């Protein structure tokens, strides 16, 4: 007999998460009657994902019955102060219940009780009846119910990403049992539920108290023995409040529910009525997935499989998709391609058609409308086909419209399309089972992808136009894709023998450090084992336990723990040194060797559509993460050399570009003046913040502190974060920040204004209309909202800086082509561009690169680019 599985869903919180997961597409999700449908759609996607993964035999969705519960009777302010529920969300709630009815899923609410109590009660009943239980919620309150029979999953991102809590996982993550999780909430309180807790007790302090005393009751039993402190005073004063908070936070597992497990059997949906409901909501893709006949849906896709190409199959309006079987288009295989012409769709797996004179000539002379141009240009270059810059890149268009989701065609289909598309993992399989099916089925899958691209292209164009983002696509992202493709194709020469020499040298250093660690430890052990290291440090050597936390797997030996221990224990400094050199050895010195191809070069891939700020990232391998602060990390750059003997590498790096952008955006007169006068910005800041009259009187420590404040402000740092960075008290850090804002009022005004704007719009923009969506900017959770506010402050700065570098790269590429230079752009790392320059062009090129970067855009402060050249990247940096 199959195991009984119960799926319990906190409907109120999951629906709320679904609403905000698709909040940025709110206006797109409307049916013909004008009803917003994003929460309904997102809720259905979550349900489908859970049903497929959990395969429950029984299921219930529990809802809150109203604002008045037994908890509000004992504490009137319970859940007080919550923001008003958006009307666009409230209007969808009845239809979510209707969706559940058509899906054959029981839903239930109970007067005077919350959804959590219904779930808790059914959870205990199901345990007694031998069920395996999965609980799903958007709030962490239900974590207290996890045990050997019950997994609690908390939605993290979008509609399909969850964090699964078991007792072991909770112990590993927080060092707590499920019962202690309730006590933690009693101590901390919960702003989203308006549970008071104990004054000034946060998560870290709460966990520390519980690890020492076991429970809330244990804390108060031992309170007399605690040393006098403000925390002790708060615990004593708020004792009644703490126990009230525990009662409020504890789920009632004996609620008087009027349903039983026998009422929750899941038998599947009412297909006919669910299909009608999808029609009413305008969910055409879901309707197709349900495979219900509809006048709006064709029975099968009309496309033509071709083995040869003629001119009448091609048009300047054709849309192309080239299918790669794998991720790395430098090495993985092209397996087929599809294109449109008028209302016809063509598909083939005959790669030799790329050499057909008619087709090759068309591809090389036409600016293509395509999905993922950079991939296609690099791929087709391997077949001797040299593409021009694109006319329209559908993948980049989607990225500019929304950075919340990935940019795969299946995602584009779900957000903007009507054609039902199976995602690649489902279609091809994964791991060792990944394979291409028989030809007709495979080409039909490609044709479905093309159908999505054809139907969504005009939608994406219209939305970009509405957002004022067409210039961002046409003048920045698409030209940049062309430049990046050329850089990737060029690659950079890497001397494997240099890496092998470094590997041998590092092995000696690692062996020496290992022996020194053994001597200080008084025994041999596995230095790479966190568990063995934890036992050695905290049991055998007796280092203070307050520096770590103990989980089920042992003592934490994370970097932050070791860094705090290093000043009092010489062995810890050696262990930190060991870890650094071992990481450099495995990840870079050895790791990079695997990425050197037959031409002696590394061809990294620049991911243009990943980050939410617009910054580029680098993969296969990641060259942006090569350590720059440690000399052992910098030495790796010695292996990166020019391809030709009579050439050098030239590195040009923007100086303090984010602070310059901050000066421009904030219009702060003092920051602008400092940059315009060419002052050392950190010295200038130190003088204003610390009241120093002359630059010569600014000490190295003053400048270091000012630098930390300058860059901290860019990232919305708190007094807590700054105090950690500088090793000072939070009071001192707060004083630094307060004085900074007094001395630079334009910056404070900018920060306040950009957060206000983000709350109103739900997003922020760079100088070039690049958007960063902030669905959590109005969150009821203080920490989540605070992170969104810091993101709102930083994103226009970091994003604008990234955009300026992109403009410089595009202009520099144009200048190199126009001048007929042999110089090639090879790498882009953070704010740096690396070029290979023939020595005969070096003088002219240094002037050209510097001028191009510094004149890429006109700001209210000058842009400065610093240059260095050398025989290796190390020397050029």
Swiss-Prot record:
Family statement drawn from the similarity comment of this UniProt entry: Belongs to the DNA polymerase type-A family.
The protein's enzyme class: transferase
Gene: polA
Reaction catalysed by this enzyme: DNA(n) + a 2'-deoxyribonucleoside 5'-triphosphate = DNA(n+1) + diphosphate
Pfam families listed in its UniProt record: 5_3_exonuc, 5_3_exonuc_N, DNA_pol_A, DNA_polI_exo1
5'-3' exonuclease domain location: 177-270
EC number(s) stated in the UniProt entry for this protein: 2.7.7.7
Function text: In addition to polymerase activity, this DNA polymerase exhibits 3'-5' and 5'-3' exonuclease activity.
Alphabetical GO biological process terms: DNA-templated DNA replication; double-strand break repair
Domain 3'-5' exonuclease: 302-465
Keyword flag Nucleotidyltransferase: yes
InterPro entries (alphabetical): 3'-5'_exonuclease_dom (IPR002562), 5-3_exonucl_a-hlix_arch_N (IPR020046), 5-3_exonuclease (IPR002421), 5-3_exonuclease_C_sf (IPR036279), DNA-dir_DNA_pol_A_CS (IPR019760), DNA-dir_DNA_pol_A_palm_dom (IPR001098), DNA/RNA_pol_sf (IPR043502), DNA_polI_exonuclease (IPR054690)
Name used for this protein in its record: DNA polymerase I
Entry keyword Cell division: no
Keyword terms, alphabetized: DNA damage, DNA repair, DNA replication, DNA-binding, DNA-directed DNA polymerase, Exonuclease, Hydrolase, Nuclease, Nucleotidyltransferase, Transferase
Origin organism lineage: Bacteria, Bacillati, Bacillota, Bacilli, Lactobacillales
PROSITE patterns per UniProt: DNA_POLYMERASE_A
PANTHER family referenced in this protein's UniProt entry, alphabetically: DNA POLYMERASE I, DNA POLYMERASE NU
GO molecular function, one term: 3'-5' exonuclease activity
Subunit structure: Single-chain monomer with multiple functions.
NCBIfam families reported for this sequence: pola, PRK05755.1
